[in-house]
Amino acid sequence: AVNVNTNVSAMTAQRYLNQA
């Protein structure tokens, strides 16, 4: 569960940086 949460968090951060 923790691993999945970390993966989603990193994915969200990457999308945010890509959008900016």
Swiss-Prot record:
Transmembrane segments: none annotated. Keywords: Bacterial flagellum, Secreted. It comes from the Bacteria. It is found in: Secreted; Bacterial flagellum. The keyword Secreted applies. The keyword Membrane does not apply. One of its GO terms (cellular component) is bacterial-type flagellum. Belongs to the bacterial flagellin family. Flagellin is the subunit protein which polymerizes to form the filaments of bacterial flagella. This is Flagellin.
